[in-house]
Amino acid sequence: ENFITKHCNIVYQGVETETYIAVSDVQKCKVKKIEWAGKEVYLGLDLAMTTDNCSDSMVGVGDNGKIIAESVAFIPADRIDEKNKLEHIDYRRFIKAGKCFACGNRTVDYEFIEKYIMQIQERYGVKVIMIGFDRYNCLSTAQKLESAGYQTVEVNQMSSVLHGATKLLEESILNLNFEYEQNDLLEINFGNARCSYSANMNRYVNKKKSNGKVDMVVSMIIAIYLLQQNIFLGEEAFGVQIG
């Protein structure tokens, strides 16, 4: 039995990671423009260490019933050249396109991110229903957003929590039930994303095993989780509300 267990573990480790979604499949869902005005939306935050990339994603349901999505990244302003060299991409191009924001100095300015989030309703003409976040590095920001009148929900980045949203996002893309506007940085994040399986065979995006930055994909999965719970499953009680 021990031999079989060890043998199975070896096999399992051999197929531990796999590509999440092919970029070519994601690109099939690209549209020229999304009409956000009047939509109810859910936000997902992935606030990593202040020296690393952070991301905010917004999702909702379009008039055609498809999931509509937008995602932006935040990086330390004084580390642009360093990150360009290390990651072999041009962050200045993404900043010019409005899909990435450089803030702070050597570290990301959380206050900038908080202000950005608080301006989303006015900028897009949407109504923010909920904001999902992971407790790690985000508790202070979540409390500030709560004080500003937003409903924030802690969404643990565990496979047992996010596997359903991970699957929904994948299936929505593969079935062309997903739309996003031109966003090269998001596509790069999807290209970097690698998945693993938990002991219960729950599939999840594995940051440590991924081939580069995946913060935009992770924040989108968190937002999709809220959308799934509220719209597709109709559940009202979930997560841990902060307040």
Predicted regions and their residues:
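Short, surface-exposed amphipathic charged segments that create phosphate/polyanion-binding patches used
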Residues: 166-175
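RNase H-like, metal-dependent nuclease domains and their acidic two-metal-ion catalytic environment used
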Residues: 1-157, 163, 167, 180, ...
